[in-house]
UniProtKB/Swiss-Prot annotation:
CDD domains: KOW_RPL26. Gene3D superfamilies: 2.30.30.30. GO terms for molecular function: rRNA binding; structural constituent of ribosome. Pfam families: KOW, ribosomal_L24. Part of the 50S ribosomal subunit. This is Large ribosomal subunit protein uL24. The keyword rRNA-binding applies. It comes from the Bacteria. It comes from Streptococcus pyogenes serotype M5 (strain Manfredo). SMART domains: KOW (SM00739).
Length: 101
């Protein structure tokens, strides 16, 4: 998967289109990512010892990886490619040619 935890991404589809944020978690088995502040859902929690009343908690839901583009250091969104530099496989932005890793 071309997106990793900590990458700055731009959402390119959906209700949060245009939002730029950081990837909190990558889920490669299901091709989804959790992006900070994107795809917020309300989750009802049962009462427990920490929260005796119960609560409605807002949290980020996973979005499909095809709905985000990785931003390089200059803030330019583009596709991600792979190349070998000094015997090590690195990710790079196909638009700017800048190494991401």
């Amino acid at each position: 998967m071309f997106v990793k935890k900590g990458d700055k991404v731009r959402v390119i589809a959906g209700k949060d289109k245009g939002t730029e944020a950081v990837v909190l978690k990558a889920l490669p088995k299901v091709n989804k990512v959790i992006v900070e502040g994107v795809g917020m859902i309300k989750k009802h929690q049962k009462p427990n010892t920490e929260n005796p009343q119960g609560a409605i908690v807002e949290k980020e839901a996973p979005i499909h990886v095809s709905n985000v583009q990785v931003l390089d250091k200059n803030g330019v969104a583009g596709r991600v490619g792979y190349k070998v530099v000094d015997g090590k496989k690195v990710r790079y932005s196909k638009k700017s040619g800048e190494v991401l890793d």
